[in-house]
UniProtKB/Swiss-Prot annotation:
SMART domains xrefs: DeoC
Main location: cytoplasm
GO molecular function list: deoxyribose-phosphate aldolase activity
Name of the protein: Deoxyribose-phosphate aldolase
Gene name of this polypeptide: deoC
Organism of derivation: Clostridium acetobutylicum (strain ATCC 824 / DSM 792 / JCM 1419 / IAM 19013 / LMG 5710 / NBRC 13948 / NRRL B-527 / VKM B-1787 / 2291 / W)
Amino acid sequence: MNIAKIIDHTALKPDTTKEQILKLIEEAKQNNFASVCVNPKWVKEASCALKDSSVKVCTVIGFPLGANTTATKVFETQDAIKNGAEEVDMVVSIGELKDKNDDYVEKDIEEVVKAASGKALVKVIIETCLLTEEEKIRACKLAKKAGADFVKTSTGFSTGGAKAEDIKLMRKTVGAGMGVKASGGIHTREEAIKLIEAGATRIGASASIDIISEN
């Protein structure tokens, strides 16, 4: 199984340096990862370095809390695309989801989808570790209804990461036609394969080299 082609090679820590970003980019090019996932500050740098490569530039929106206003998320999306982003991973408005304010949650996603329309894929991070099963299902349904391309488990900055049972639930909820991204705490090839077998079509990891280096 060629896992590399579905990995978003990720560096989102606040203390990430330019040297680390350049290393990330080189590793992504050498191993044909799906994308590099970097904070918005680094999108232009990554886009320039990857212009002759099949590796996409992915960034994060409303990250890591999802508590920005919709207008802020829209601006972040537009700015990221202007700087060269081809995929955006937005964080759902978790508090509004828990308050059952589904219209707000759907509109929040929909506006980012509109801002990205035809220019970038949109992945919606639902932060599974903070949600009940009912909330996970509702979040996935709202993301699909709003026109997002993927649902994604985690930011990697909360209380937990990707679990196979969550991926199974997300896949069952969105059906076969939508992407499901597993991220957060994935360190080994074995873990990645379990998540793929559960229904993940993309893996987000900072330990990508370790994952693909294992037999």
